[in-house]
Amino acid sequence: MLYAIGLRLIKPPFFPLKEINIQVINGTGSSNMELQRITHEQIEHIARNEIKGNFLSMNLVDVRDAFIRLPWIREAKVKREWPHGLNVTVEEHRALAHWGSHALVNTYGEVFRVSIDEKLPVFIGPKEDSAQEVAQQYQRFSRILAPIQQDIAEINLSPRHAWRIQLDTGTVLELGRNEIEIRLARYVSVYNHSIARLNQQEPLAYVDLRYPDGFAVRMPEVTPHVPRESGGRKAT
């Protein structure tokens, strides 16, 4: 989607900048997009307060930096359009999840800081550098869970690189550090004919999948320190 903003207040005597054209793209390069988070008022503020000089003298690096500073802008490219225009191509962040309680993760697995009150999964990791790994694993976990129509509410990656998932039902799945996708797939494979029966009254509180030939479950009313085991020696 192309937006054009006229600039009546920017009138240097020679080569005045009269128009800014905004093109919105997504991560695949598609340009048939609309602004979702950035407002026209924010763009006009940049045009009237951040762009210095005329069509020829304005510093394109400074203009790009002004757009990048907008909280929801992930990337921006600017170029002159003869004789009095400026073309700006922007890509907005697309929020995938909350990162803890103070930031967001976009679909690239990048952490950015914007405050929103939206229901999104929560990612927790030992450091921001791990956000991309958590985002990638979220996609894999979601595909595995799709057959039983359960969504992820929270993913926790510990400093020891152990994985834990909380589902939208409230059930916590302990996956450990090894064979995490195999363990989750095993949970899905037995869900309909085994685990779902235990879920008839209330969702399970906890399922420990770190056993090579079984798993342990905790019912909501059971004391947390005494899980009921289905067999096997717990792995890591």
Residue ranges and their predicted role:
Residues 1-54, 58-69, 75-236:
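Charged, solvent-exposed interaction patches on well-folded alpha/beta domains
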